[in-house]
C-alpha cells in the first residue's frame, strides 16, 4: 500500500516473492531518503503480514486493512499515527473479508469497497469509516460492475475508482460524491483497458497508468485526467519498466511511483512532476488581471459567453465559493475580501458546462 500524510509518503506491506510483509517505510521527498517506521501492529504484530491490502488517510491518520496473508482473505483494520509512530487496531471492516479492494479518504472519513471475497465473488459494495466513532456504515454500491484490482484515489473533495478486473479488462472511471452519497460515471480512461494500474490526484488533474492490459502486456503509459473538462490526455510514459501492481502517492504537486511486478518483484521508485499548465487546457482562454488579487477578482474572457456560475476552489480542490454571475464586457468580477492570502483556482460555467478555468493568487 502507499499513501501520503503530513508532507511525507509511506509505502508498506506487500509480498517480496518470498514472504508477506508488514513493514512500513517513510519517504522524505526533500532529502530523497527512506526511513523504516514501526511495522504494522508494532512489536506484537507478528502474523499481520499481508499483500493486496488497502490504505486511506482520514482525520490526519492512516488506516490499513483487508488483503491476504496467512489467511487469504482479511477484514481487520489498523490505525497508524505518524506523529507517534504507533499502531492501534480499530473496528474490523464491516463488509466481507476480501483482497484487491479499492479505498480512498475524504477529509474525516475513509471509504472502502469492491475487491474479491473468500467465495470468489467479485464485490461492488462500499463502506464508510468514521474514525471518531470507530464505526463502519454501508453506503451506495460502486456505480460500475463488481471488480477487483481497480485504481482508487482522492482528488479534491471526491473519490475516484476506475479500471480493474470484472472478469475482463475494464476502462470505465467513476467519481464518488460524499455530499450526496452518489456515483457518477466520468469519461472512460483513454488508455487500453487494464487492471493492476495505479493513480494519484494533484488537483485539478489526476494521473493513472501502468498495469496489465487487454493485450496481455505490462504497461508503462501514463494519462492525465482533468477535473474541469472530464477529459484524458496522454503524458510522458513512466520511465521504469512496464509493470502492474505498483504503488504511488502524491506529495504537494509531485507524484511518486514504484515497486510492483513485471515478472519479478520490484523496488525501484520514481518521481513525476506534471506540467501544471491549466491555461493549456482552456476551452476559452481567460486571464486574471491584476494578479495577484487583493479585494476584487477580475476574470477576462477572450470570447463573449453567458457565464451563469463562478466557483472558487482551494488548491486541494475544496469548493470555497459558488455564485451566480453575469458577464459584463467579457469580464467576470467578484469580491474576494474574505479570502486569505494564497493560491486559488476558479472555474466558470455556461449552461452547466465548464468553459474557462485557471489560477489566481490573493495577496493582502
List the predicted regions and their residue ranges:
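Kelch-like beta-propeller repeat domains
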Residues: 1-275
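C-terminal outer-membrane/trafficking sorting elements
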Residues: 281-289, 293-364
Amino acid at each position: 500500500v502507499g499513501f501520503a500524510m503530513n508532507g511525507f509518503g509511506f509505502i508498506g506491506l506487500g509480498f517480496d516473492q518470498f514472504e508477506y510483509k508488514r513493514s512500513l517505510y517513510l519517504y522524505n521527498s526533500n532529502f530523497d531518503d527512506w526511513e523504516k517506521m514501526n511495522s504494522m501492529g508494532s512489536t506484537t504484530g507478528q502474523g499481520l503480514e499481508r499483500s493486496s491490502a488497502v490504505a486511506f488517510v482520514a482525520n490526519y491518520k492512516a488506516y490499513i486493512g483487508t488483503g491476504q496473508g496467512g489467511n487469504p482473505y482479511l477484514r481487520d483494520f489498523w490505525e497508524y499515527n505518524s506523529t507517534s509512530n504507533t499502531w492501534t487496531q480499530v473496528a474490523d471492516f464491516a463488509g466481507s473479508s476480501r483482497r484487491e479492494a479499492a479505498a480512498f479518504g475524504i477529509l474525516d472519513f475513509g471509504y472502502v469497497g469492491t475487491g474479491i471475497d473468500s467465495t470468489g465473488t467479485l464485490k461492488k459494495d462500499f463502506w464508510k469509516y468514521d474514525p471518531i466513532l470507530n464505526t463502519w456504515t454501508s453506503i451506495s454500491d460502486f456505480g460500475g460492475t463488481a471488480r477487483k484490482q481497480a485504481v482508487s484515489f482522492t482528488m479534491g473533495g471526491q473519490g475516484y475508482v476506475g479500471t480493474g478486473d470484472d472478469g475482463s479488462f475494464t476502462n470505465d472511471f467513476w467519481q464518488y460524491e460524499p455530499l450526496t452519497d452518489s456515483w457518477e460515471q466520468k469519461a472512460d480512461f483513454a488508455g487500453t483497458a487494464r487492471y493492476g494500474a495505479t493513480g494519484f490526484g494533484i488537483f485539478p488533474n489526476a494521473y493513472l497508468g501502468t498495469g496489465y492490459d487487454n493485450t496481455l502486456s505490462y504497461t508503462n503509459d501514463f494519462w492525465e485526467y482533468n477535473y474541469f473538462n472530464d477529459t484524458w490526455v496522454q503524458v510522458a510514459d513512466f520511465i521504469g519498466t512496464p509493470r502492474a501492481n505498483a504503488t504511488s502517492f502524491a506529495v504537494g504537486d509531485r507524484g511518486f511511483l514504484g515497486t510492483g511486478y513485471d515478472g519479478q518483484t520490484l523496488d525501484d521508485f520514481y518521481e513525476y512532476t506534471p506540467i501544471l499548465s491549466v491555461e493549456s487546457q482552456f476551452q476559452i482562454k481567460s486571464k486574471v488581471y491584476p494578479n495577484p488579487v487583493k479585494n476584487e477578482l477580475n476574470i477576462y474572457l477572450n470570447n463573449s459567453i453567458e457565464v451563469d456560475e463562478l466557483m472558487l476552489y482551494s488548491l486541494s480542490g475544496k469548493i470555497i465559493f459558488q455564485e451566480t454571475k453575469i458577464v459584463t464586457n467579457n469580464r467576470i468580477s467578484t469580491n474576494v475580501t474574505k479570502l486569505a492570502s494564497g493560491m486559488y483556482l476558479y472555474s466558470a460555467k455556461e449552461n452547466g458546462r465548464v468553459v474557462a478555468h485557471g489560477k489566481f493568487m490573493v495577496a493582502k
